[in-house]
From Swiss-Prot:
It comes from the Bacteria. HAMAP family: Ribosomal_uS19. InterPro entries: Ribosomal_uS19, Ribosomal_uS19_bac-type, Ribosomal_uS19_CS, Ribosomal_uS19_SF. This is Small ribosomal subunit protein uS19. GO terms for molecular function: rRNA binding; structural constituent of ribosome. Protein S19 forms a complex with S13 that binds strongly to the 16S ribosomal RNA. Keywords: Ribonucleoprotein, Ribosomal protein, RNA-binding, rRNA-binding. GO terms for biological process: ribosomal small subunit assembly; translation. SUPFAM superfamilies: Ribosomal protein S19 (SSF54570). The keyword Transferase does not apply. Pfam families: Ribosomal_S19.
């Protein structure tokens, strides 16, 4: 079920404050965050976030196409190495 329109998008306040100060100061340093649940807002465009995926911080550069999505969508938590190849000489 989708979030109600009247509530608006969810963003952690500490992340919003860090993004506003980075925009005002013109800082290019990435913003480190654990908040994968925060929605990407239009004022985040052009910023870089380091999003934690449970093991390391993944750099996420925000562009216009990402607005409305969550930060966690761009930092995968699981690694799939692929299925094993068939063994040809098995008989």
């Amino acid at each position: 079920m989708a979030r109600s329109v009247w509530k608006g998008p969810f963003v952690d306040l500490h992340l919003l404050k860090k993004a506003e100060t980075a925009q005002e100061g013109g800082s290019t340093a990435p913003i480190k965050t654990w908040s994968r649940r925060s929605t990407i807002l239009p004022q985040f465009v052009g910023l870089t976030f380091n999003v934690y995926n449970g093991r390391k911080f993944v750099p996420v550069s925000v562009n216009e196409d990402m607005v409305g999505m969550k930060l966690g969508e761009f930092a995968p938590t699981r690694f799939f190495p692929g299925h094993a190849a068939d063994k040809k000489g098995k008989r």
